Structure formats: structure tokens, C-alpha cells
């Protein structure tokens, strides 16, 4: 098997403006900064306020001969930011994005989504579609994605192969679903459901056997409790206990209709937190998508167990209802929060669009709570799209910002030079870098993303 693609044979070096987050409230904008990436793709040095005349000395201090590799001097209106992290994405829904507006969640699944996902029984269709999906996300600067695949084992393996071949960091999960889906699109029985997930986990371990830092890992993925009976949930809980390095992802308190059906199926449990905890699927490795309607006890449980929330503001507000997750309250309680495109329930794969919608819905929440939950700032939304997402995915020791020792997953953003200026607000001569950064976040798009790096390797198509 081929190992994960790595950086080129030479280090990378940059001088210019570096922007990243250390916490939800600590955004660092670092002008005149020297950043050095070693040949393995790790950040070796980050030195703010660097005079260009001292760069050769810094290179030598880090063990390299000056002039052996070029230093990229970022133009005045350009900067580096960490790669975006999509904490919730349905890769098989790539071609159905934007469809089914106005439908309830369960009707959307039954009338549109299950039929589309069933197409992935065809491995050639899976290869074409997953290749396009991963290329598309990389173009948007999404360097890491947590993917739900379909129920098909062969197609799920293809998604993992595509991610690694194209250099995207990914969590890939085979969807477990043995009930409340059409007979032509559900697992044959509970035993088969758990068995195929076990096989996928083992396959990924063998897939990564020659790589001590794999980009692609498996994630345990019960679609939601409605689609999994107790035998499946119990079996997946056992897999989670036996594979302590793996994340767990599911949909959690997404819509009132879904929550009511879950209560009917599992009447012995007071709420979803108790349900998933009972089966060993709720802990610090859990990535819980949506989390709209949590009871007080559930919030306390998520905080105590250090669970992560994948906030999906586009899909939450563009289907049948306008649903607003209490993100400010989650942050107040120290609950990990990242952003998810939720493609294709979400119509956009742009993390810039997701950030903007997170800002919008938090403003609605502030109005709803009469100011008790203040709106998120633009800087906080940027944190959620980068370091917050890394925390949710259990990758913050490796990516999410430019701390020395982390891997260089980054976007080179251009706001003026060589960029079509018909969408982003024009950058004017007197604009401070803080103003330029906000213009990019609020009015920019993928045309402003000149380069995308994963572990030091340029990957944008």
C-alpha cells in the first residue's frame, strides 16, 4: 500500500501576515512573521515581527543552509490562515445539495436522500462522485472533513482511498442503519451492520499500516438512533470501547420530529444523551451533529463527558424550520464546538458561507434570548471553523492553528493581487489588515484561496 502523500523534499518558508486563533476570544494577527515548515510538513518555527534581513539567520538557526530553498514573501494584502475543518459532511449527498427545501428531516430522507445514497452500491459511481466531492472541498479550503459515507462497505473504502490520494485529512465512517429505511437501503440485520463496520475499521488500519501519521482514519458512525436498533447500538459501543483511538459521530437532537420518533422507539430513556451514554457512544470522542434542542441535563452531560458539537447553521435554518443551536451557551459551558457544512442538507460546501450563517443565527439567538446569549463575533466564527473544529475532531494536537510542532494545514489567501474583485469587497489602500481579514470572511469566496496545504503539501486542484 502507498503511504500518505507528504511534503516535498524541501522545507517551506513564508514571511508575511499570519492569522490564527488560540481560543474563541484570542485571535492573533501577526504581521511580518516568519514561518518555517520542515520536510515532514511540521511547523518548525513561528517568529513574529521578523525583519526580512534576519531571515537567513533564522533559517541557519533552525539547521538549514540559507538560500537552499526559497522564502515566499506574501504580498501586502495576502495572509496565511489555518485550513478549514468540516466537522459534519455527507459525502454521498454531493450531487443532491440544495434539493428538498421545505421538507421535514424525515420526509427529506425518505423521499430524496436514501434513494440518492443507494446509488453508491455502484463503485464506479462512487469513484466519480467522491473524487469530485473531495476536489470540491479542497478548493474551498477544507483541509479536514469528518465524513458520513453510505452504508456500502466497498464505496466507503473508496472514499478513504480518494481522500488519501488527494491529500485531504479525513475521518471516514460507514453509516450503520438496519431499520426505518427502505428495504433496498438498509443493513440486512444488526449482525451484518456491526460486522461490516468492524471490517471497515480493520481495513483502514491495514490501509494505514505503513504510515505512522495517517491522514485518513475510521470513525464509528451510527446514522442516528432511529436507524439503529439496540443490538446495533450495543455492538457499536463495543467497537468504540475496543478502539479507543477512534471518534464516534452521530446526529443528536436535530429536529423535533426526529426527537419524538426517537422517544417512541426508546421509551426507557429520558433523552438522547442518556440513550447514547447507555450504549457507550457518548464520551470525549463523540462528534454530535446539530444539538438544537438540548435539555439542561443533556448540556451538563455533554460538558462533563467532554463531547464535541458539530454546529450546522445552514442546514438547520434552510429546511422546513429555522432552528438555532445555543452555541453561545455551549461555549460558556466549555463544550467543544466546530462548524459543519452538512452537505447536502446544507446547500453550500463553503466554510466561509457556514461562518457567515453561524454569525447570522447567533444574532437571531441573541434576539430570541433578549441578549442573554450574545451573538458570536466574526473572530469567534473563525475559531469554530479552524481550531474549534480540530478540538471536536480530536485533532487539535496536530492542526487548527500554527503552533510550533503542529502540521502545516493552511490556506494562502489573496485579497487583491491576481484576484477577480467582482465579489469580495474591494481592498482599499488605507485598509488595516484587520479590515482586510473581515472583508475576506464576510465577502470573500474560494477565488481568494490561492493555495491549500495539508501537512506542507499543496493540494488545491
Residue ranges: model-predicted function:
Residues 1-69:
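N-terminal metal-binding scaffold of metallo-dependent hydrolase/deaminase domains
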Residues 23, 407-461:
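C-terminal cap of metal-dependent C-N hydrolases
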Residues 154, 158-291:
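Metal-coordinating catalytic core of metallo-dependent amide/deamination hydrolases
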Residues 95-126, 179-190, 255-285, 305-308, ...:
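Active-site gating loops and adjacent loop-to-helix segments of metal-dependent hydrolytic enzymes
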Residues 79, 97-168, 195-212:
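Alpha-helical scaffold segments that flank or form the walls of functional sites
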Residues 17, 278-285, 327-426:
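His/Asp/Glu-enriched, well-ordered alpha-helical/loop segment
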Residues 17, 35, 77, 88, ...:
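Divalent metal-coordination and catalytic microenvironments
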